[in-house]
């Protein structure tokens, strides 16, 4: 398969800092979208992975799964986006797309195993998948979201991990006007949970052991 060299920031060992490196990205196939990365959020799991805190990092590791960028190429069968559109990529870039879970749009429960944006097994090139701390990425259109261009694109990036992590249970439990939602902790996810739940019309209660969080919680609604 043809590839293109792109610049990235990654690490070759748990005790090494992030350094600039050159990585390969595949050329687009029929259902692929190539994205020029404009913004990539920093999730704490990026740090855990780079340091091999969980014990299963495959090096080289290029973190980043909160990706926002501009579509630069599309495959012949792509229908969701066009060149020039703003696109987002979250934590997954592949799955079998044929099992019961995938057919229900629950690819995170893929019965044969989903592929993470980084640290997974690259089915096209072999080796580990390499994430968004890079100039470009190529992803199957099924795992790409169209992002409205009028949004603050830097602020959109964290929604692709922390945002969807809190949005998913709110949607699953059909939270809306009259619902009551409890949020434990006011960190990166907690503040999003409060804003999203309030936006859906719920009554929200925050549980925190830190008195200093009260002012922030009230400011969030």
Q: Where are the regions a protein language model picked out?
A:
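Short structural boundary motif marking the start of a folded domain
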Residues: 2-9
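Cofactor-binding loop segments of dinucleotide-utilizing enzymes, especially the Rossmann-like FAD-
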Residues: 13, 38-40, 186, 209
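Glycine-rich beta-strand-centered segment in the early N-terminal region that forms part
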Residues: 26-40, 53-103, 108, 129-130, ...
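Cysteine-cluster motifs in flexible loop/terminal segments that predominantly coordinate metals
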Residues: 43, 91-142
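Cytochrome P450 core scaffold surrounding the K-helix E-X-X-R motif
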Residues: 45-51
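Mid-domain Rossmann-like dinucleotide-binding core that forms the NAD(H)/NADP(H) cofactor-binding site
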Residues: 135, 142, 149-221
């Amino acid at each position: 398969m043809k590839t293109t060299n792109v610049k990235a920031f990654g690490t070759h060992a748990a005790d090494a800092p992030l350094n600039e490196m050159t990585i390969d990205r595949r050329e687009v196939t029929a259902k692929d979208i190539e994205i020029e990365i404009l913004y990539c959020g920093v999730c704490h799991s990026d740090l855990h992975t780079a340091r091999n805190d969980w014990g299963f990092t495959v090096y080289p590791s290029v973190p980043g799964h909160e990706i926002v960028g501009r579509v630069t190429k599309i495959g012949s069968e792509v229908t969701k986006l066009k060149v020039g559109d703003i696109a987002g990529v979250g934590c997954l870039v592949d799955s079998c797309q044929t099992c019961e879970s995938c057919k229900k749009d629950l690819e995170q429960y893929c019965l044969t195993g989903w592929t993470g944006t980084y640290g997974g097994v690259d089915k096209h090139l072999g080796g580990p998948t390499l994430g968004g701390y890079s100039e470009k990425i190529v992803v199957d259109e099924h795992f790409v979201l169209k992002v409205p261009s009028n949004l603050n694109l830097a602020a959109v990036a964290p929604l692709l991990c922390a945002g969807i992590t809190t949005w998913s249970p709110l949607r699953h439990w059909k939270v809306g006007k009259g619902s009551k939602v409890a949020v434990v902790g006011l960190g990166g996810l907690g503040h999003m949970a409060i804003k999203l739940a309030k936006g859906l019309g719920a009554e929200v209660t925050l549980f925190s052991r830190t008195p200093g969080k009260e002012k922030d919680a009230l400011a969030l609604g």
